Structures are given as structure tokens and as C-alpha cells.
């Protein structure tokens, strides 16, 4: 019940733009702690004591310190604090950052839900899946020619992150507290590097800084969308929030250096008009795909560099943006190699006694598996050598036979699940062969037997385990016709339930 009460209070605080008082609510830190535990150790991977030390007694002491109106008393490393929370001196700061991230995330989510309710566009929930981008690219990229592979620069000044949140968070006290946290983390990071200790910024508060980085990227993308939609949308009411931005036209005036005409003349943006241009962002990279000639892509390239330098004060070199022709180069996207290949098609046309052969080449998006990089990952995980030859997993030899088989089966299932959309299955078959033979060698090593002798004893039963797992996945997709599902297994299958890229050995 307290959780629902917290969400209702967040909604009321958002309506009045007062988020700072929520930092003094105990249930906020309970929500943040629960979210951290539900993320499978994503946040607290190197801080096991955080779960053991967490209690509402610590939360009460934290809130009491914040009521002193002196933020520097919160994180001071006096002896009493160290005795109370052990060797982890930054527990208070970690709790504050997680509570802060929870407040802002939930507040922005409520804004998004209310916006979608008004627009009635919240239908495609499968867009949360990583695989949802590939069917879109199959439909759109087959007739596009050029792609820009863009490495998004990180903000170099902490004040930029605060300025970005000013457009969505109106509470000045909340933003001042955020500024304090950021500068404290910056000093702690420098101190931890000097002492050769683990950085608090890199892992312990990863969710907090990932949220700030995503806010920075969304600001960059909103300006990109703002200019992409041409002069007909510049005065649209849907972009009213963008027009209210402080110094927007002043900062974006750096475009004059490229175009040589004042920015007030909106018609200068018409040269960027391209109805067949698509934008995709993943992790710290983004891709612009277009049908036009390289001239337009080069204009976008130098525009983006100027945008980063003038609006975000980030120095970025043009070398961070690579323009390639899709028919000649491959793009690395979410574990796949993407390229556009030509599929030759000969059509025979006959009119009375005359017949003609017409060559009609069609473009097709090729999705290939980066075999060598995955073999490198398997080598690092000690499943094979650098040449791709399977070896035994010695660290698993002490486990039971069923546990060893189950681990390898899950790894094969993860590979089949994620790379089911590959246009060429040979690479996937080779990876699964490496894992299967590594499983056999691991079991043979455990029983002090040879691979040949072990296969004669348990070969058919072991093979059934792998085949049963794959048929089980396909039968969920095509329950009425398993034979048809086996034929379709050679084609592309995209799953809409994949929310993240798991490591090969994530189920250890």
C-alpha cells in the first residue's frame, strides 16, 4: 500500500513541480532499494555489503542529516560514520543517488503515460524489444544506400547535465541538490583514481549516471528531430516546449558558420529535407541511413559536429562520424553485421512469338553473425581456443552432470534465441557445435574418460537434451505444426521479448 501511496504523492508533486520534498520520504529509498535488488545485481555488483547494511535506521539517520540544511554533513567520513556503516564510506551517497534516480524516473514516466493517454498511441509494446529494430530495417534499408555511423560524445561539464534536466524538472531546489551530488561524485572519482580504488561513479551508481546520460542524449535527439521536421513544424504547437528553451536560437546560431545565412531564415533548413532518412540509436552510438547521395550525409555530418560544439560545448571531431555505402561496408548493430546485398532475379517476358529476359536485381538486408568476435568471447570464457577448437570448461568439472548439461543447453538456447534472425545460419551452427563439443569434453574430463568413449556411452541422450530445448522454443512459436516450424527454423525469426543483450555465461 505504501508503494501506491508513493506513486500518488509523486503524481501530486509533479503537478506542482515540487520534487525536492520527496527526498525526505522513507518509502522512496525503499522503492529504490527494491528496484536495485530486482535488477539482478546490475547496480550493486561490487558492493555486496550494501544489501546487508541497508535498513530503515540508516534511512532515518540519512534524512536527519539532510534536515540539517548542510549537505556536506551527509557524506563526511568521520570515525563514527565509518563505525556505523563499516568500510563502505559512501553508502549514504549511494542511497541518495538511487532515490534521486527513482524520483525523476517515476516522475518522467508519469508524464509519458499522461502524454500517451492523450495521444492514444501506446499500442506497440513490442518496441521495447531489441529485435524490434531489425524488422523495421528489413523494410526500410533495402532501398537505402548510405549510412552514417555516429559515436555520440559524452558531456565534458557537469553543468550541462543539470541544464538538460531543467526542461523537464522545474523544482529549483531539486536541481541545486542534483548539482551538489554531481560535483561531489566528481571529486570522489578523482580521489578514488589517486588511491587506485574502485570508482564510485563507474559501478556503484551506474543507474544514476546512465539516467543522466540518457537525458543528455534525449536533449540532443529532440533538437535533431526539431530541425529535421522542417519549417512547417517550427511553429507547430507540438514543439512548444522546444521553442521555450533558454538561448536555443542563440546556441544554434552556430549553424551560420556552415551555411553563411542567418538562422532566422528557416528556409535554409530545406537542404536537409530527405523523406527517406532514418535514425537509430543504440548504446553510445547512432546511425543515420539515407537514400540520397553522400553530399547530404556530409552536410548532416558537419551539422552534428557543430551542434555538439555550439549547444553542448562538447568538442567532437568529424572522424567520429563514418559515412559508408551499405552495399560495400557492414554496420555493427546490436551484435549483428548489417549490409545490403543484391538478390539477382531474372524474369522472362513473352509477347506472342517474342520472348525477353529481364534482369531485375532486388536489394535485400543481410544480417550476419560476427563470428570471429563471438569466437573471441568463447575463447575468453574458456570454451575454445583462439582457432575455434572446443576445449573443456575446467571450472565446471566439479558440478553435477545435469548441472553441466543444463548450463550448456541454456547457452545454446540464448545463442539460438538472439541470433535466430541471421540470414546465414552456418555461423550459428558453428558456435553451437563449439558449445556442444565443449560440453562433451567437460563431462569426459570429469569422468576421466576419452571423448569417443563418453559419446558411445551417453552420446544419444546428450544430443536429445540440446534438440529438445530447440524444439521446445520453436513449438511455442508454431504450436500447431512442429514440422513446419522445423522448416521455418532455417529462415529469419525475430523475438519481441528480448530486452537486453545477455553475456554468454550470464547463467553461471
Swiss-Prot record:
Belongs to the intron maturase 2 family. MatK subfamily. PANTHER family: MATURASE K. It holds the Pfam family MatK_N. GO terms for molecular function: RNA binding. This is Maturase K. It comes from the Eukaryota. It is found in: Plastid, Chloroplast. Usually encoded in the trnK tRNA gene intron. Probably assists in splicing its own and other chloroplast group II introns. The gene is matK. GO terms for biological process: mRNA processing; RNA splicing; tRNA processing. Keywords: Chloroplast, mRNA processing, Plastid, RNA-binding, tRNA processing. One of its GO terms (cellular component) is chloroplast. It comes from Pelargonium hortorum (Common geranium). The keyword RNA-binding applies. Coiled coil: none annotated. The keyword Metal-binding does not apply. InterPro entries: Domain_X (IPR024937), Maturase_MatK (IPR002866), Maturase_MatK_N (IPR024942). Its main location: plastid.
Amino acid at each position: 500500500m505504501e508503494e501506491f501511496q508513493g506513486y500518488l504523492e509523486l503524481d501530486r508533486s509533479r503537478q506542482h513541480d515540487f520534487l525536492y520534498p520527496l527526498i525526505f520520504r522513507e518509502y522512496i529509498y525503499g522503492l529504490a532499494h527494491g528496484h536495485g535488488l530486482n535488477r539482478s545485481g546490475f547496480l550493486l555488483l561490487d558492493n555486496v555489503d550494501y544489501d546487508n547494511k541497508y535498513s530503515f535506521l540508516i534511512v532515518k539517520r540519512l534524512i536527519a542529516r539532510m534536515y540539517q540544511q548542510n549537505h556536506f554533513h551527509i557524506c563526511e567520513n568521520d570515525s563514527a560514520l565509518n563505525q556505523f556503516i563499516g568500510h563502505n564510506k559512501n553508502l549514504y551517497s549511494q542511497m541518495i543517488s538511487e532515490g534521486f534516480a527513482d524520483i525523476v524516473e517515476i516522475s518522467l514516466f508519469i508524464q509519458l503515460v499522461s502524454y500517451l493517454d492523450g495521444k492514444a498511441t501506446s499500442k506497440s509494446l513490442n518496441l521495447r524489444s531489441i529485435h524490434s529494430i531489425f524488422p523495421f530495417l528489413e523494410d526500410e534499408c533495402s532501398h537505402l544506400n548510405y549510412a552514417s555511423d555516429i559515436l555520440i560524445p559524452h558531456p565534458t561539464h557537469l553543468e550541462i547535465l543539470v541544464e538538460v534536466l531543467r526542461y523537464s524538472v522545474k523544482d529549483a531546489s531539486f536541481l541545486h541538490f542534483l548539482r551538489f551530488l554531481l560535483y561531489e561524485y566528481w571529486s570522489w572519482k578523482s580521489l578514488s583514481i589517486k588511491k587506485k580504488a574502485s570508482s564510485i561513479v563507474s559501478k556503484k551508481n551506474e543507474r544514476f549516471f546512465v539516467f543522466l546520460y540518457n537525458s543528455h542524449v534525449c536533449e540532443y535527439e529532440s533538437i535533431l528531430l526539431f530541425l529535421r521536421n522542417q519549417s512547417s513544424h517550427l511553429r507547430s504547437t507540438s514543439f512548444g516546449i522546444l521553442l521555450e528553451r533558454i538561448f536555443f536560437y542563440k546556441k544554434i546560431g552556430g549553424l551560420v558558420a556552415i551555411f553563411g545565412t542567418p538562422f532566422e531564415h528557416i528556409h535554409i533548413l530545406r537542404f536537409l529535407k530527405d523523406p527517406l532518412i532514418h535514425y537509430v540509436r543504440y548504446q553510445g552510438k547512432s546511425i543515420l541511413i539515407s537514400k540520397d547521395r553522400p553530399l547530404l550525409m556530409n552536410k548532416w555530418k558537419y551539422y552534428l559536429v557543430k551542434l555538439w560544439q555550439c549547444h553542448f560545448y562538447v568538442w567532437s571531431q568529424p572522424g567520429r562520424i563514418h559515412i559508408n555505402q551499405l552495399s560495400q561496408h557492414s554496420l555493427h548493430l546490436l551484435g549483428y553485421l548489417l549490409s545490403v546485398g543484391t538478390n539477382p532475379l531474372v524474369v522472362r517476358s513473352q509477347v506472342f512469338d517474342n520472348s525477353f529476359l529481364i534482369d531485375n536485381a532486388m536489394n535485400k538486408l543481410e544480417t550476419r553473425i560476427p563470428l570471429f568476435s563471438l569466437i573471441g568471447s568463447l575463447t575468453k570464457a574458456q570454451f575454445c581456443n583462439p582457432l575455434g577448437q572446443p576445449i573443456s570448461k575446467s571450472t565446471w568439472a566439479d558440478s553435477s552432470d545435469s548441472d553441466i548439461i543444463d548450463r550448456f543447453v541454456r547457452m545454446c538456447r540464448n545463442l539460438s534465441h538472439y541470433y535466430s534472425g541471421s540470414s546465414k545460419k552456418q555461423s550459428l551452427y558453428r558456435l553451437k557445435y563449439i558449445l556442444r563439443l565443449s560440453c562433451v569434453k567437460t563431462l569426459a574430463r570429469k569422468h576421466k574418460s576419452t571423448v569417443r568413449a563418453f559419446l558411445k556411452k551417453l552420446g544419444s541422450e546428450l544430443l536429445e537434451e540440446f534438440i529438445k530445448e530447440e524444439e521446445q522454443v520453436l513449438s511455442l512459436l508454431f504450436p500447431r505444426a512442429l514440422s513446419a516450424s522445423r522448416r521455418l527454423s532455417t529462415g529469419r525469426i525475430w523475438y519481441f521479448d528480448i530486452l537486453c543483450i545477455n553475456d554468454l555465461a550470464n547463467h553461471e
